[in-house]
UniProtKB/Swiss-Prot annotation:
One of its GO terms (cellular component) is cytoplasm. InterPro entries: GmhA/DiaA (IPR035461), Phosphoheptose_Isoase (IPR004515), SIS_dom (IPR001347), SIS_dom_sf (IPR046348), SIS_GmhA/DiaA_subfam (IPR050099). GO terms for biological process: carbohydrate metabolic process; D-glycero-D-manno-heptose 7-phosphate biosynthetic process. Homotetramer. It comes from Alteromonas mediterranea (strain DSM 17117 / CIP 110805 / LMG 28347 / Deep ecotype). It holds the Pfam family SIS_2. GO terms for molecular function: carbohydrate derivative binding; D-sedoheptulose 7-phosphate isomerase activity; zinc ion binding. This is Phosphoheptose isomerase. Pathway: Carbohydrate biosynthesis; D-glycero-D-manno-heptose 7-phosphate biosynthesis; D-glycero-alpha-D-manno-heptose 7-phosphate and D-glycero-beta-D-manno-heptose 7-phosphate from sedoheptulose 7-phosphate: step 1/1. HAMAP family: GmhA.
Amino acid sequence: MIEQIKANFTESIQTKIAASEILPEHIEKAAYMIVEALIRGNKVLSCGNGGSAGDAQHFASNMLNRYERDRPSLPAIALSTDTSTITSIANDYSYDEIFAKQVRALGQPGDILLAISTSGNSRNVIAAMEAALSRDMTIVALTGKDGGEMAGFLSEHDVEIRVPSNRTARIQEVHLLVIHNLCECIDDSLFPADHGDE
């Protein structure tokens, strides 16, 4: 068991090193897109399933509350938190629609959809992307493996941050690091501070 634990640490480190070689430009582009949207008065909607739902909520909470330093709240909504809405949509329509109907109701042109799926094949996340495109929103997709079907829905105006791994756990670990990087870049862009004083 000890050896397996050590192997998991090693694999996680190796995945992060590989990601550090290919993802920074994509993360920077996504951060700039979000910053520009926020400056225009737009917001970020985030969605995902399971651990990715947790990541979507983590991002939204960091935006609404704070990341590492005090600053004004930023508008972000995690679409996985309202159980009454989610269960009513799933019951009356389909689980595939639980995010899409919220995007059609809440999304405005210029808003950002942060769509998270380790496989890139989550049907309800893809439906949310389709809804976002119909609302003239921009998409930031966090994926893994081969990008799945989500990769095919993205245009040059969107950005995919694809983790170079086929293991769900490793992808989720890097997704969290990506989210923390996004939050830091957003804060540094909107609220520059002298880090030496912190």
